Regions:
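PLP-dependent aminotransferase class I/II
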Residues: 1, 11-12, 16, 24-28, ...
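Active-site phosphate-binding strand-loop segment of PLP-dependent enzymes
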Residues: 5-87, 93-95, 240
Length: 266
């Protein structure tokens, strides 16, 4: 399960739940917030286990001044258009400081080959095309500026919504610098809340409505509702508020005002 306050994987989660058969873990920097990757990475190394960082939502997020995606054996990034750094379509990348892993990843992404017509293993066609690469190269120069704007918007939400008793915000871990791919809150009676904001011209999202252990794809594991209470609470109550680099400050305050009005009425 995730931590009930940060909504991320924690060292306590890992040390309490990991089995003797485990060989590694995948940790997700969810919503653009960094999980406790430094301590978890140290624990995994001491126990000779690998760690993959899912950095799909954390382009530029930091912990103790160090970028997420640089602690594990491998990090994965998504460049889907909706991400903080997005291409024109589906795209992604893998980073690692292990030469052997890098070679293997290059093979797998190019049909199992390192040179033309010589296939050493079975692979896929996951090559990033030139147009996507050019778009990402241009956008990369703007990423930090965009992340700064996201943080400004998030601060307005933090300062305003933290005073509303019916709204729960995730706790940012100490010495971390999120990039707020999503600004998530928890509220009860989510559908009523979402519909009210929609009527007031405010679009929202849900990330994510079904926890992994209740997905049909993982039913073979035998989990049931109640097994991961923190994850379930987040999935059943989370609402994502509007946040993007070019969002006007007046619009952010408008969203906050409508949220305050909603809870005054209810």
């Amino acid at each position: 399960d995730v931590d009930k306050d940060s909504w991320q994987i924690s060292l306590d989660n890992v040390t309490e739940k990991i089995s003797k058969e485990a060989v590694g873990i995948i940790g997700v920097h969810l919503y653009g917030f960094a999980f406790d990757v430094e301590n978890i990475s140290n624990f995994m190394k001491k126990n000779n286990m690998w760690m993959i960082e899912d950095s799909a939502q954390s382009h530029g997020a930091k912990i103790n001044g160090r970028n997420t995606g640089t602690f594990g054996d491998i990090a994965t990034y998504s460049f889907f258009p909706g991400k903080n750094l997005g291409a024109f379509g589906d795209a992604g990348a893998i980073t690692t400081d292990d030469d052997d892993l890098a070679t293997l990843c290059r093979k797998l992404a190019d049909g199992g080959r390192l040179s033309k017509y010589e296939h050493e293993i079975l692979g896929w066609n996951s090559r990033l095309d030139t147009i996507h690469a050019a778009v990402l190269d241009a956008k990369l120069t703007l990423l930090e500026e965009w992340n700064i704007e996201r943080r400004k918007i998030a601060k307005i939400y933090d300062d305003t919504l933290s005073n509303i008793e019916q709204v729960t915000l995730p706790v940012k871990l100490k010495n971390t610098d999120p990039v707020y791919h999503i600004y998530p809150i928890l509220v009860e009676n989510r559908e009523n809340f979402i519909n009210y904001l929609k009527d007031e011209g405010v679009s929202t999202g849900i990330h994510y409505p079904i926890p992994l252990h209740l997905q049909k794809a993982f039913s073979y594991l035998g989990h049931k509702e109640g097994d991961f209470p923190n994850s379930e609470k987040i999935c059943f109550n989370e609402v994502s508020l509007p946040i993007f680099p070019y969002m006007e400050e007046d619009d952010v305050y408008y969203v906050c005002e409508k949220i305050k009005q909603y809870f005054k009425k209810t």
